[in-house]
Structure formats: C-alpha cells, structure tokens
Amino acid sequence: MKGQRLLFLLYFATCVCAQPFASDAVPDSVWQDSITGIRTHLQHVDSLAPYKCPLHLFGKKADGTPKQPALQAMIENIGINALVLGWDHYVQHREWTEITSKVLERNLTGAWVWDNDSFSGNQFAHPYHGSMFYNAAREHGLSYGVSLIYPIVGSSTWELFCETNPPAINDFLSTGIGGAALGEITHRTSDIFFDNTKTGAQRVAREIIGTFLNPVRGLHRIISGEMFRINRLHAGKKEKPEPYTFQIGAGDRYIHDIGTFHPHTQQRYHQHVPYLDFRFTYGNHYNNLDEGKATRAYDYFDLYALVNLSPDNPTIGELDIRGRIGSIQHQLPRRWKLDIGLYQNIRYIDHYGKDGQHAGNLAIISEAARFG
C-alpha cells in the first residue's frame, strides 16, 4: 500500500512539474505528460475572458484569437443557410426550395408579406434557425451587442434568396429577434455541459447534450478536434460560471372538450397526454445588490419547457423564456429589493394534435419577440 501511495505521489509530482512548451510547428501550447509522453493541446483560455475560437479561416493573431472574426462568422452564416436549404431541398424535397431567377427578382423587388405557414415552423423552427446565426458570431468571440446583427442578416438572406415564398415580415422577426434570445440562452446553457476536463461516458453525454443545444459550437468542436481532446488545465468555458437551478417533473394531462369532435373517431375530443416539464433558472436575479456586479445581458434568465410524450401531440408543447437584458437594482427597507430592467420574453404554446386537430379549446400562442 505504501509503495502504491509513493508511486502515486511521484506520478503526481512529475505531472505538476512538467512544463508546457511551444514551437513554430505547434502554435498552441502543448502539455506533455513526462511519464506517458502523451501530448495534450492547451488553448490557455481564461474562463473570465472571451473564448478564443479554435477555427481560423484567415489565420490568427499572436494571442490566439482569429483574424477577421466578424467576416468569418458571416461566412458561417451563409454556410448555415446553405446547409439548411440543402437539407430541405435534397432530403425533404420541399417545393419552396425550387429557387429560380424570377423568384429572386420578385423577392428583391416585391413587397414583404405576413405569411400563414405552419405554427411550429414559424414560431419555433425560425427562432431555432436564428439561434445558429447568433451562435456563429458568439463562437468567434463577438459580444452580445455585435452578435445581434447576425440573425438579422441571416434571416434577411434566407427570406430573399432561399425560398420561393415572398419574404415574410413575421419570419424575419421570429428568426432575427427570437433567434438572438434563444441563441444567447443556448450559448450559456451549452457552456455548462461542454467541459474538456471530463472523460468517459460523462464526457460523451456532455458533448451530445451541448451539441443538441448549440449545434454551431458542437460543429466547431468536431472540426477543430476539441471534442475529442482532454485538457487537464482548462475546461474550455466561454462564460464565467453562474449559479443555476434545474428542476424536472412528470405528469399527465386529461383533455376533454364537449364541443369538439375528433376527425377520425367522430367522438368528442378527449385524451390523456403524459408529459415531462423542465424549469431552469440561470444566474442570480439580484447579482448587482448581492455581489456588486454590473448586470450583463442574459446573466439572468428563466426557462420553462414542456415536452409531450404522446404520439398525437407536438413534442414541444410549451416554451417560456424570460431573459434580462439590463436592469437597475435598489435595496429597499426591510430586506425588500427593487429591480427595474428590460427583459425579453419568448412564449410558445402549441396544443394542436399532429393530425391537425386542435386539442380541445386549449390556446395556441407564440410571442417570439416581446420586451417588457
């Protein structure tokens, strides 16, 4: 036992004493284990500083940050649209992807409209699409304010060049504004899961969940190889860790409507809908008062999601997000606290059955862009 303990101490000492080195052939520092000889690439990312993108289309500066990050992010925006359009055209065979020169001329010169496409497509898929534009900018170290431009530009190019349908105002708002909100939330939430110090099954699970939340960052990690490297010194975080709480619940809703007949059974609408619901709170609501920190965009937000487990109902039944953009806080007498701030809200409720039948008289509503 003593021998094993001594061996462990010697191994630990050699690992601690081993020094990272740099060379012209390997621009990033490399950690070399003095016993095994295994080299681990280190990015030396300070968790308190903006993250340095591992991809460098135009080379990188001496500090490791990419040259032309804004241009590189814009190129990725074009690539995202091309990838989504290719999927819809070649795999889904969507009719609205048959783009011609006449369609482009009409889109560029004609008036914008308010379309009436599918509820889930307009109110959920578009913000999710916009979040990828936004995260392409955040992935390159651009700030929250600058990154807001990218879903707006990405949405505009999609409406003008990627659909046979006339450009739609509501799609532009859902993708541009709703996408920015969803993008910052997935940017921060995925950062909780991605951790380069983890190994084994936990690392695999973290990579899968993080990539599902933030596909752009997951793709960056795959291309750069960061997804498959273990880093003993740095977790690869982009944001300073904030406190968070997570709750999960399960239940069953019984829907019965005496005024609606099911289209197939011709009976009054009634069904059991099992579900899972999730509540996630990120950050400290009163961080300015409690910790003396200046509030930053989305350093505090609430998220509620309901996932239906019934094959007859949409998978995403509800999504409610409230994120703080900025606020002024005051301490009042008797431990009362006052927060006067600007908040962005996203609300999505869909209780239509997959057969198109409304599940009773439960409301469907979406607010992809709301401030208050």
Language-model features, listed with the residues they occupy:
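Bacterial N-terminal signal peptides that target proteins for export
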Residues: 1-7
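Bacterial N-terminal signal peptides
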Residues: 7-16
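N-terminal targeting leaders of membrane proteins
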Residues: 18-124, 130, 134, 138-140, ...
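Alpha-helical membrane-inserting segments
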Residues: 79, 83-87, 137, 157-161, ...
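Alpha-helical transmembrane segments that form the membrane-embedded catalytic/substrate-binding core
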Residues: 129-130, 162-191, 209-213, 217
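Small-polar-interrupted transmembrane alpha-helices in polytopic inner-membrane proteins
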Residues: 141-164, 176-180
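Outer-membrane beta-barrel translocator/channel fold
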Residues: 166, 170, 188-200, 344-360
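Contiguous hydrophobic, core-forming segments of folded domains
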Residues: 361-368
